[in-house]
Amino acid sequence: MSEDDPRPLHIRRQGLDPADELLAAGALTRVTIGSGADAETHWMATAHAVVRQVMGDHQQFSTRRRWDPRDEIGGKGIFRPRELVGNLMDYDPPEHTRLRRKLTPGFTLRKMQRMAPYIEQIVNDRLDEMERAGSPADLIAFVADKVPGAVLCELVGVPRDDRDMFMKLCHGHLDASLSQKRRAALGDKFSRYLLAMIARERKEPGEGMIGAVVAEYGDDATDEELRGFCVQVMLAGDDNISGMIGLGVLAMLRHPEQIDAFRGDEQSAQRAVDELIRYLTVPYSPTPRIAREDLTLAGQEIKKGDSVICSLPAANRDPALAPDVDRLDVTREPIPHVAFGHGVHHCLGAALARLELRTVFTELWRRFPALRLADPAQDTEFRLTTPAYGLTELMVAW
């Protein structure tokens, strides 16, 4: 950490880019997070090849956290806190394989095709509301902070009349401005709602993710596993997509010559979305990997039990990844970025995220071809304390 920026090195950003000191840190380096009695030392990987090696090797690196000193690294475990049951990132194969296989019915190609018309409808509903409010308007408040939650509720199977309440509970138990007691109460209410919904789905499976899983696997997927996975889906999909929408629009407005990619064919839009995902990389890092044994990585001696943090934004700006990698180029052929992770923990919802972003950006410029920054000289307000990078406000005009 530095006096100028107290945040851990792996989450430092400057505008749309990773911080210079993060990019200059080296392929694999030691970092300290926290201070005093709370200080923890980790390895931090920034090179694309090293990040892929760590995330892709579940034999040597575990994602499962130990909550008991007797628990072997990456073992089946003797204790997992309730909040981590169903969180795929806290499971290693074969546990991970078993659970992920049961959850894939909610993310099939058929499921994504069924979701497409709804996503288009919710995006246009939000754009209608923004247009009615008049120019200028805050794109974050009207679109970026609204679309992802609505899409995720449809995916999971939350009844439409419950969705406003459901999202308030989801956001409330993460709100750092609330007391710990209040957040815990909201989190408990959120969990109880999910368990009640799962019980209903077991009696009469619907078309959402929970219904698809219980229809195919029944009691083989436990209530707690389904509850935990729903929490993971909501937390990962909401913040990440909100961040990508805001930053993506800002990036395109700063590079207006590239907006035509979303006015052309679907293949051009798909390529543009993939480049925006790589260039912006809103998640800072996945769950730290724990070395299962002594090993050598990028010339460094890693000890069994050492923690490795993988910086996804830095890895996706590694000059070894592609020529001119610091430049946004939506016509670039897709390159093997790690914004969705890598290996067995590659994001299960990657196809949904791409579909959602492609719909938002395509419909936005179809509806508002003259969209522009309301005040190009205004300082941009970035979210610095949320799990994924994003904007607090983006005033646009048309």
Swiss-Prot record:
For this protein, the record's PROSITE patterns field holds: CYTOCHROME_P450
Which GO BP terms apply? vancomycin biosynthetic process
Q: Which residues bind heme?
A: C347
Pfam families membership: p450
Which cofactor is recorded for it? heme
Pathway(s) annotated for this protein in UniProt: Antibiotic biosynthesis; vancomycin biosynthesis
Keywords in alphabetical order: Heme, Iron, Metal-binding, Monooxygenase, Oxidoreductase
Q: GO molecular function terms here?
A: heme binding; iron ion binding; monooxygenase activity; oxidoreductase activity, acting on paired donors, with incorporation or reduction of molecular oxygen
EC number per UniProt: 1.14.-.-
> What PANTHER family is this protein classified in?
P450, PUTATIVE (EUROFUNG)-RELATED
- Family of the protein in this entry: Belongs to the cytochrome P450 family.
The free-text function statement in the UniProt record for this protein reads: Involved in the coupling of aromatic side chains of the heptapeptide of vancomycin.
Tell me the protein's name.
Cytochrome P450 165B3
Origin organism of this chain? Amycolatopsis orientalis (Nocardia orientalis)
Q: Which gene encodes it?
A: cyp165B3
